[in-house]
């Protein structure tokens, strides 16, 4: 099944950039020269018959990560932004009913590596996330 239930709004003009920055107002976010608003089109998504699960979010996540990987290959920086005002986003970008804004991907050239301050991240141990044969 290849329903492709996604929609991409590429934002690079002044008006669009101002709109997207209203939806997620962070200093680092404002410096991006281009954004992609990735939306799930629930009107055309695949629904699993056994339990009614709408797979639009899963398909959108796969497409978004491919965008991020392609940008990285071109030495561009990206970030998944999911904690934004989705209602305002729907309004400002005139999204139709059934089309949900899922993630904003700002894209730009990253700062030089020495500018970043690295903070250690706790990662779950392998045996916390992988089980063999059974949960």
Q: How would you label these PLM feature ranges?
A:
Residues 11-18, 41-45, 86-87, 111:
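Short, charged/polar surface micro-motifs in flexible loops or helix N-caps
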Residues 1-34, 135:
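N-terminal amphipathic, basic helical "cap/leader" segment at the start of enzyme domains
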């Amino acid at each position: 099944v290849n329903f492709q239930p996604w929609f991409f709004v590429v934002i690079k003009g002044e008006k669009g950039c101002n709109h997207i920055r209203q939806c997620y107002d962070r200093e680092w976010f404002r410096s991006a020269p281009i954004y992609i608003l990735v939306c799930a089109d629930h009107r055309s998504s695949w629904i699993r018959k056994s339990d009614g699960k709408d797979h639009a979010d899963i398909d959108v996540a796969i497409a978004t990560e491919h965008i991020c990987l392609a940008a990285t290959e071109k030495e561009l920086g990206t970030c998944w932004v999911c904690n934004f005002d989705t209602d305002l986003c729907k309004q400002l970008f005139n999204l139709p009913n059934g089309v949900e804004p899922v993630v904003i991907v700002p894209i730009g050239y990253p700062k030089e590596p020495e500018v970043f301050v690295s903070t250690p991240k706790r990662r779950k141990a392998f045996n916390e996330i992988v089980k063999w044969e059974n949960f």
